[in-house]
Swiss-Prot record:
Residues 913-934 have a biased composition (Basic and acidic residues). The keyword Transferase applies. Residues 579-701 form the RdRp catalytic domain. This is RNA-directed RNA polymerase. Residues 945-954 have a biased composition (Pro residues). Residues 972-982 have a biased composition (Basic residues). RNA-dependent RNA polymerase which replicates the viral genome composed of 2 RNA segments, RNA1 and RNA2. Residues 883-899 have a biased composition (Polar residues). CDD domains: ps-ssRNAv_Nodaviridae_RdRp.
Length: 982
């Protein structure tokens, strides 16, 4: 009995121990301890690859398309051009990042680079075998080669990779110079000229992935074989399955993926390994996706179908087609799922039912119907839309295109799809564009200005009157200390230049020019930025800063240095004293300055103001600004003559003075005296001007022309009409200071950036946030910016860190006193009118933006068909687009080479106080002109501006009933005056 009890006790104890041990082994406590130990082991064993984050960022920033053409007569010219362009682009990115290209399967053109040449196809036998060593200085470059190499082993080397590859977004279709189909998950690619290849496609459609590599080296492979033979590998596999950790394991490399679109179905892929670990330390499949081949095939008992889902700008699209067939169909994924659901619920299904449900032609519907009959599960791989470069253009023609093989450097990027189906364009950086810049912005305008110039003795006297009126007391000005100038120049590059040149006083006056990176509504001559030596700029700035503070800020027509709210009040004050407002537009303003304007007006003002102690130095600095030797970034020498050097300290103030003088001179030529003409100058900001309508269009344009300028009257707006100043549209400045950013100009470029340094997502947030400060209530602009921010990750940005954002948010004073806005429904009419759509169409699209929730790539776009005619002949979007002829006049009467876009069609005028429609008296009336009108009476803004603005004074003439009533009498008085010989 005792023995039985003892045995029972032993069995019970053993059972208790087993149960306790089982509970302990399966407890969360032990699992947490094992997981913590595993995490510590991972932290000890993982290796971070040096500079991976920096390399990825540099590749993103430096990815600028370089186009390389091939000889005419090539059997597949377009495909070869794209391939060569991709190779040159990748090589350029590597070298700009400071690394060396390592080219796998190089062509004869890349023979000078390190690389590897093995035999994958018959064409490879043209070259010899080679295999250079890969070092830390290399970035691997491949062009149409990744299909044939072991990407797991290659990525496992830990070296960044750039590759140009085929990434189809449909299961069959046309490609440049050929077509492709897919069978057994292999692409069959046929190109004109006889190229016929089959290969698998790697799936790069994840932003972060991993690969497992085999052991490298003789001893590592020998040890692996011994572990396999002795069963150690099997035991390790069991422990790994149960515990998630085990001894030994294969190398695992984690890497990031970025894709950049080169063409239809063609991408440049950037692969940057950033960490390594061992497969035995972590359940790697739970962490992310392993790099694998694409799987297109959908197996079933009837017929094998191929399917692939592509995330486009307008949402996911699914492509379907029978294996090996060229015919395929692509439709929205949501539509296909709805059609399939209806098919499954219906008792009888005919082809006609699928045609009706899909809304597709019979031929396409037949493919959908066949797929539904096959009852495919349709588990398709997802292909993501790659990042795009913005649209760039390059000048063509015998005068500019001196090197037919030259392909410009692209720089602008898109952080979202364009709000409109039409988008702005950017000039690429190239020699041909530099030649076009010199011709279209400097040499050409200078020649035309000289042919127009006609300076009379009276004009010289009026110029002296203007100088004396602006500077009534001579010799009082002194420059600010250079330390003050340095304090104002807070940008990093400015500070670096100040530090480098602080102890250098002598310099050679050489103008170094470059093409400005900016967007244009349509191809135009790129603007020229002419930089001057740092010492010249700093010394001259000490005078311009002092003159601005002591003189310019105190005159009523000078708008720089004022906040947006103050400028809006100035516009309203000008409207209050006028029954008509005139918008002016100068064409190529900087390039049309001549010696009279520079020396007898601009320089004369500064010299009259400065004290005699400083006159010699100022005279030398001003003389340096004329006819200085100049050279472009690519080494093209040119003569700027008397044109404005746009990088000079004189630019903003000098242009404002010249603009004001034209208005003043026109008033004097109309018969006004000095004080009267001064009071009717209006307001100016650089080359932007707005004045009262008491001088005729003809007199204004003729006056400007006699000085060499090319001035056009954009709009002569009566009371109650919209007016534009500084690219902002005022609905009715006679009753409200509210305005909106010019809709067309803004929406064409809102989604782009010229910033090549910052992260693209940060730029998108900063730019949309800036527009929500200045234009949150502007229809479409505000809606689009809110839709963008609603569908992406919020960020904290500092406006000072970004160059390519609106000027009016870079200053805290401007942000605190931003443009007045209102929520009037009439703004919808203004925006719709500029975009060439109806108000109903606009409101429908705004509702889509407000309701949108999804990826940024799918933001709704408004379809527009605005006439955006090129101002010069260019290569754009793979085509030659001809510019206007020399004698061509645009249909709306505006200057065909002007930088300002032509206004859109007019709205019908609303009735005035007399019951009749008010008429807008624009120059060259035409339906192409914007002619919108609003009510005369609107509530005024109750809150005053933050600081007073010098009001536009009321004319001193007591017999003037309206703006133009006294002009006839003034002209008579002027003729009766004794002529004075000047």
């Amino acid at each position: 009995m005792r023995r039985f009890e003892f045995a029972l006790a032993r069995m019970s104890g053993a059972a208790f121990c087993v149960y306790t041990g089982y509970r302990l082994l399966t407890s969360k406590w032990l699992a947490d301890r094992v997981e913590d130990y595993r995490q510590r082991i991972i932290a000890e064993k993982k290796q971070i690859l040096r500079d991976a984050a920096m390399i990825r960022t540099q590749i993103q920033r430096e990815m600028e398309l370089v186009r390389i053409s091939v000889r005419k007569g090539h059997s597949h010219q377009e495909a070869a051009t794209e391939r060569n362009s991709a190779t040159e682009t990748m090589l350029g990115v590597v070298e700009k990042c400071g690394y060396e290209p390592y080219v796998i399967s190089p062509s004869p053109r890349e023979v000078g680079y390190h690389g590897s040449r093995q035999f994958y196809s018959l064409a490879d036998f043209r070259q010899d075998y080679r295999r250079d060593d890969i070092t830390d200085r290399h970035i691997i470059v491949m062009t149409d080669v990744d299909y044939y190499v072991d990407m797991h082993e290659l990525i496992g080397l830990g070296v960044p990779i750039l590759l140009y590859t085929f990434q189809p977004s449909t299961v069959s279709g046309e490609v440049k110079d050929g077509y492709f189909t897919i069978t057994d998950d292999s692409v069959h690619y046929r190109v004109a000229g006889g190229k016929d290849v089959r290969h698998r496609i790697w799936n790069y459609n994840h932003d972060t992935m991993y690969v497992c590599s085999r052991p490298r080296g003789f001893w590592a492979n020998l040890m692996q074989i011994l572990r396999d033979i002795t069963g150690v590998t099997a035991i390790c596999s069991f422990l790994y399955t149960k515990l998630g950790i085990a001894p030994f394991g294969d190398p695992v490399t984690m890497f990031t993926v970025d894709q950049f679109k080169m063409g239809e179905h063609r991408n440049i892929v950037s692969i940057v390994p950033f960490a390594t670990c061992r497969s035995n330390l972590l359940k790697i499949s739970e962490y992310g996706a392993e790099l694998e081949y694409m799987r297109y095939q959908q197996r079933n008992n009837i017929a094998n179908f191929n399917a692939v889902t592509y995330i486009s700008e307008n949402g996911p699209l699914i492509s379907l087609g029978l294996e090996g067939n060229f015919a395929s169909v692509q439709l929205p994924l949501q539509d296909f799922e709805n059609i399939r659901t209806a098919y499954e619920l219906s008792k009888t299904n005919n082809l006609s039912d699928t045609v009706r449900r899909s809304g597709r032609p019979c031929k396409e519907a037949a493919i959908i119907h066949k797929c539904l009959q096959a009852e495919c599960a349709v588990v398709s791989e997802v292909v993501h839309k790659p990042g795009d470069l913005a649209r760039h253009y390059q000048a063509v023609g015998s005068a500019y295109d001196t090197d037919p093989a030259e392909q410009g450097k692209c720089y602008a990027r898109e952080y979202a799809p364009g709000p409109l189906t039409q988008t702005a364009v950017f000039p690429s950086e190239s020699r041909s564009n530099e030649l076009a810049t010199i011709d279209g912005r400097i040499a050409g305008p200078q020649a035309k200005a000289k042919s127009r110039e006609h300076i009379t003795p009276k004009m010289r006297k009026v110029a002296r009157d203007f100088v004396h009126h602006l500077v009534p007391i001579a010799g009082t000005g002194r420059p600010y200390p250079l330390t003050y100038v340095e304090e104002q120049q807070t940008k990093p590059l400015q500070r670096a230049r100040n530090d480098a040149n602080r102890y250098h006083d002598e310099f050679t006056m050489m103008v170094k020019a470059f093409q400005k990176k900016e967007a244009y509504n349509a191809p135009n001559y790129p603007r020229n930025i002419s930089t001057v030596p740092h010492t010249q700029n700093v010394k001259l700035s000490s005078y311009t800063y002092a003159f601005k503070a002591s003189v310019l800020q105190h005159v009523p027509w000078y708008m720089p240095t004022h906040t947006p709210a103050e400028i809006a009040d100035a516009v309203q004050n000008l409207a209050a004293s006028s029954t008509e407002l005139v918008e002016t537009d100068y064409s190529k303003f900087d390039g049309t300055f001549l010696r009279f304007m520079r020396e007898c007006v601009e320089f004369a003002i500064y010299k009259r103001w400065v004290h005699l102690d400083h006159l010699p130095e100022l005279t030398t600095l001003l003389a340096n600004e004329i006819q200085a030797p100049a050279v472009t970034r690519l080494g093209i020498k040119y003569d700027p003559d008397c044109s404005r050097l746009s990088g000079s300290a004189l630019t903003t103030d000098g242009n404002s003075i010249a603009n004001a003088f034209v208005s003043y001179l026109a008033g004097r030529m109309a018969g006004m005296d000095d004080d009267e003409a001064w009071s009717w100058i209006g307001i100016v900001y650089g080359d932007d001007g707005l004045r009262s309508g008491n001088v005729s269009n003809e007199l204004l344009t003729n006056t400007a022309s006699s000085l060499g300028f090319d001035l056009k009257i954009v709009n002569r707006a009566p009371r109650g009409s919209p007016v534009t100043f500084l690219s902002r549209v005022y609905l009715d400045p006679w009753s409200s200071p509210a305005s909106v950013q010019s809709p067309l100009r803004t929406l064409l470029k809102l989604h782009t950036t010229c910033d090549t340094q910052s992260e693209i997502d940060d730029i998108g947030w900063a730019k949309t946030q800036a527009y929500l400060v200045t234009d949150s209530k502007t229809p479409f602009i505000g809606h689009w910016c809110r839709a963008y921010q609603r569908n992406c990750t919020a960020r904290v940005v500092q406006y000072a860190d970004y160059a390519d954002i609106p000027f009016w948010v870079k200053n805290d004073d401007h942000v605190g006193n931003s443009w007045p806005q209102s929520e009037s429904d009439d703004w919808n009419d203004i925006v719709a009118n500029e975009l060439g759509v109806t108000t109903a169409e606009l409101l429908k699209h705004l509702a889509l933006l407000d309701a949108y929730a999804g990826p940024i790539s799918g933001l709704p776009r408004l379809t527009t068909s605005i006439d955006l005619e090129p101002k010069m002949s260019v290569a754009l979007d793979g085509e030659i687009q001809a510019g206007p002829s020399q004698n061509k006049t645009s249909k709306d009467g505006t200057n065909p080479t002007s930088d300002r876009s032509a206004p859109r069609r007019a709205r019908a005028a609303l009735p005035g106080d007399d019951g009749h429609a008010r008429r807008s008296r624009r120059s060259d009336r035409d339906p192409g002109k914007r002619d919108a009108h609003v009510r005369d009476k609107r509530p005024r803004r109750s809150s005053p501006p933050t600081r007073p603005v010098t009001p536009v004074p009321t004319p001193s003439s007591g017999d003037r009933g309206t703006d133009g009533d006294g002009l006839g009498r003034a002209a008579v008085r002027q003729r009766q005056r004794r002529r004075t010989q000047v």
